[in-house]
Amino acid sequence: MSKFPEKGLPREEVLNLLEDKTKVDLTFSSGKILGSMCTMPHELAIEVFARYIDRNLGDPGLHPGTRKIEEEVIEMLSDLLHLEKGYGHIVSGGTEANILAVRAFRNISDAERPELILPKSAHFSFIKAGEMLGVKLVWAELKQDYAVDVKDVEAKISDNTIGIVGIAGTTGLGVVDDIPALSDLAREYGIPLHVDAAFGGFVIPFAKSLGYDLPDFDFKLKGVESITIDPHKMGMAPIPAGGIIFRRKKYLKAISVLAPYLAGGKVWQATITGTRPGASVLAVWALIKHLGFEGYREIVRKAMELSRWFAEEIKKLNNAWLVREPMLNIVSFQTKNLRKVERELKRRGWGISAHRGYIRIVFMPHVTKEMVEEFLRDLREVLK
């Protein structure tokens, strides 16, 4: 058990201790992490984050330049998502963004026993949101292709429904729900639709421009009232950098509370976290400005092409098969004796994700063809 030290250690000794204690950690540079939705941040983002690490957007009056840049980031993300004027923040991640959306829907609704309809494929952050906010979660069934059954969503709408959730890039399979149909449904019943595009938000716009056949998912659809989009996933920003964008200012106002004591002056604060790293915002701004649409499209092109190649290789194996054809840069497959296969692959050092009966590989920017070929060699040996 560690005790608070009476005397400090020399700087180099502390760094050496840290190096030793973290040797067991997998790193993105190791070439072994294949199951994470995060990646090694872009080198420019690392430089910017380190340079502005003291900025605190929890007290924006002290950092008006950083506050203005956050507004520009929200404007650029809104533009990417086909919204002329959006309202939101860069937050700690998709979990906080999803909780904020549910909180906004609940606060605006007058339902006595609020309910949220969401797919069975939805992220666990909504379970947290339901517990924290006193919102009952009503789970909609999935179709055979693992997208939400829109008819089941409609069947579960009631007077207590405060919102509907659609997923643009499910955690396990990368499935994009039929957001256009959900949008039509939301408009018909006058219910706001939240799209969790924590992963897909930095993939789908660029993949569609490359010719991939993917459904619309963003503010182009009039029923969509809010979107979660995470720059610290395919956006290559440093952790933490999630994003929440609302179509209308009323949602942001509905979750804002007054913080009157701040050194920079009183401010209305909508995020869950008070202290909030401005460095994350500045890194996101720098990346978007540096890479632009063309830069991100190239990142997505490589990821999508590699994922399709891998899917075809899985089809060649006797004892492994795809769960479904990939929609985004996520490929999930099943095997005989799955738990045994998973244990052996992890014993060989692979950082993979196995849940709900399949192994998931996420083709993030740090994943190379050489890495995947090595993984396939190990997989073939394990499957023998």
UniProtKB/Swiss-Prot annotation:
Enzyme Commission designation: 4.1.1.11
Cofactors that this protein relies on: pyridoxal 5'-phosphate
Molecular function GO terms recorded: aspartate 1-decarboxylase activity; pyridoxal phosphate binding
Pathway(s) the chain acts in: Cofactor biosynthesis; coenzyme A biosynthesis
Modified residues (N6-(pyridoxal phosphate)lysine): 233
PROSITE patterns in UniProt: DDC_GAD_HDC_YDC
Catalysed reaction, written as an equation: L-aspartate + H(+) = beta-alanine + CO2
Record-linked InterPro entries: GrpII_AminoAcid_Decarb (IPR050477), MfnA (IPR020931), PyrdxlP-dep_de-COase (IPR002129), PyrdxlP-dep_Trfase (IPR015424), PyrdxlP-dep_Trfase_major (IPR015421), PyrdxlP-dep_Trfase_small (IPR015422), Pyridoxal-P_BS (IPR021115)
Alphabetically ordered keywords of this record: Decarboxylase, Lyase, Pyridoxal phosphate
One record GO biological process: coenzyme A biosynthetic process
Function comment: Catalyzes the decarboxylation of L-aspartate to produce beta-alanine.
Family listed: Belongs to the group II decarboxylase family. MfnA subfamily.
HAMAP family assigned to the protein according to its UniProt record, in alphabetical order: MfnA_decarbox
Protein name (database record): Probable L-aspartate decarboxylase
Species the sequence originates in: Pyrococcus abyssi (strain GE5 / Orsay)
Name of encoding gene: mfnA
